[in-house]
Amino acid sequence: MKSPGAAPAPGLVAAFRALHHDRAPEDPLVLPGPWDAGSARVFVEAGFPALATPSAGVAASLGYEDGATPPDEMFAAVARIVRAVSTGDRPVPVSADIEGGYGLAPAELVERLLDTGAVGCNLEDSADGALKDPHRHAEWLAEVRAAAGDRLFVNARVDTFIRGVTDPAEAIVRARLYVAAGADCVYPIGAPPEAIPALRAGIDGPVNVGAAPGGAAELAELGRLGATRVTFGPGLQRQAMAAVREGAARLRS
């Protein structure tokens, strides 16, 4: 079953790709993570030029644990988010976290994504708690790129840090393979701030850094360290739920 939606306009994908280049060091691309249509509109109203869905945040909004969302529900949720920010004459590009691709063949995965209207995707390189073979994963990413052409921005997640491999050199090896395979950006999730300069120096392409939601000064510092773009995973969704819990508690007090 395909999610309702329409493929993004080529110009929207190109605009999203351009946001990752020629940025001042202290001005990384900040991509809030909407978990539903309402939160997406809030972020757009705040002036953000693009969004990136977090799979864990979307899962929580649908009542699932992270990693347990059925693919049809994830694609449908992404389509709703895209639709919510595509009204009017200035649609906002949305990139979708689709975890490990849900076992779909590259061509089918690309078409499912395009059906949602997303301009890009996150694809991770671990499964069932273990890192994938980087060469095989790079081959798979190359198939995704071949199927997508320039219609999708591919953000290749590198999971070494969250799988206990703390040496940035290991992340760089994987990142280089993925960039050579056609990834537009790499995301060494869980990289500590002190590792960012080495990652920046060793990777030929945009680098996504994950962060806790913070202020402009913290984001600028990540940019100076080498982050091209900053995302927050489910952090904003969890902040929102904390506020809901606080409000619920007040109703009972």
Question: What spans do the regions from the language model cover?
Answer:
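Alpha/beta enzyme core
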Residues: 2-234, 238-246
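C-terminal segments
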Residues: 245-253
